[in-house]
Amino acid sequence: MTLYLDGETLTIEDIKSFLQQQSKIEIIDDALERVKKSRAVVERIIENEETVYGITTGFGLFSDVRIDPTQYNELQVNLIRSHACGLGEPFSKEVALVMMILRLNTLLKGHSGATLELVRQLQFFINERIIPIIPQQGSLGASGDLAPLSHLALALIGEGKVLYRGEEKDSDDVLRELNRQPLNLQAKEGLALINGTQAMTAQGVISYIESEDLGYQSEWIAALTHQSLNGIIDAYRHDVHAVRNFQEQINVAARMRDWLEGSTLTTRQAEIRVQDAYTLRCIPQIHGASFQVFNYVKQQLEFEMNAANDNPLIFEEANETFVISGGNFHGQPIAFALDHLKLGVSELANVSERRLERLVNPQLNGDLPAFLSPEPGLQSGAMIMQYAAASLVSENKTLAHPASVDSITSSANQEDHVSMGTTAARHGYQIIENARRVLAIECVIALQAAELKGVEGLSPKTRRKYEEFRSIVPSITHDRQFHKDIEAVAQYLKQSIYQTTACH
């Protein structure tokens, strides 16, 4: 598959397909023409010796310092080197790859003044899967993601570290191996590479993809739990949800009915009890609300994926040129969205932990043994799996605190309000990893509970899931190192996201 970039129409589904199918990038001709026109404006500014921020002046507090024309290119290289102050563990290779795609798409809007050489260098790195190693920490989220994007830019000019064919190498060595020249930054180009929100947005895109999939995966896991507890299906009737109007809730209820169709383990109202606890009865309402969050986040991300968030921005209208210093680099809209994402995913984990507690608690699990132990007393069974889930959801409650309510001044108070959007993105992904493990714990426990109940009573769809995951996690016949089972399921759930055959 080829992904065609035009600066205007990139979607998250495009990105997901690109990652699944190991695609290549192509650029449409109209976008290249826009790049040429905006670059011509920069060249005119240089020729006319105009005073324009970041082209003929310094940066930040030094915006009033005029640069000697012979040093315009040096200014851009100095910018990249000095701003590459990222720290900590690197972003995943998927996030770094998406970061390059998003920055390229922004340049194609034709408001940044980049050269075709810069555009082609980004395209080359993407298509050859030369992945810059980009530290996660160091961004305030305004002026955009300066530190992470500077590490991206270092790789393009042959000075950074990259991951290539599974090995960490110097960018310069990889470029020599591929007979490719490092990029020679021209006036404005360093700024055009780093003034933007691509780090937080790229992590946000990956987080959205994985969150949405977790939402779908949580439904069949919940369906296993529901059957193991002889849950009541009446609460999932369409008319119950239609009168509330939330489409996401209606959709979850429909999918739950589909997962449970044909089960002989489910019950009706008053057969065993009149109504279930909320963690079973309210799955459509709780999970549906998370999908509402996901839909909002998707909308915000796709706006930003196709936005010009450089500074200054170049405009041409009726043969008149405008170069305007604005603030589109400010990450506040994405920071808010990614803080919301943390809430949506945290609740999937919270309700999962409460469901699995019902499976192991002898006061709540009906006729199942305490902690599903094969020999209660001598063997502890799933006792500490619930502890682990409780620990993860409690950690998520701390991580879910909104990063976007924080701000700190920088650049001698010139940049006196920042978004902390990349912090929101990073914490959000930690929540996703924790939530995936909580759902893996519920899966391991629900598989065992279903076995004890009798898998022949499962619905056909959940029986297939049971068989699929029993190939990863064998029956619990004695105590063992359950952390291995949990991690194996969590990894399987994660890997399935980027396969063309999804779990849902």
Swiss-Prot record:
It catalyses: L-histidine = trans-urocanate + NH4(+). One of its GO terms (molecular function) is histidine ammonia-lyase activity. Contains an active site 4-methylidene-imidazol-5-one (MIO), which is formed autocatalytically by cyclization and dehydration of residues Ala-Ser-Gly. Its EC number is 4.3.1.3. It is an enzyme of class 4 (lyase). InterPro entries: Aromatic_Lyase, Fumarase/histidase_N, HutH, L-Aspartase-like, Phe/His_NH3-lyase_AS. GO terms for biological process: L-histidine catabolic process to glutamate and formamide; L-histidine catabolic process to glutamate and formate. One of its GO terms (cellular component) is cytoplasm. Disulfide bonds: none annotated. It comes from the Bacteria. Pathway: Amino-acid degradation; L-histidine degradation into L-glutamate; N-formimidoyl-L-glutamate from L-histidine: step 1/3. It is found in: Cytoplasm. CDD domains: PAL-HAL. Belongs to the PAL/histidase family. HAMAP family: His_ammonia_lyase. This is Histidine ammonia-lyase. It comes from Staphylococcus aureus (strain MSSA476). The gene is hutH.
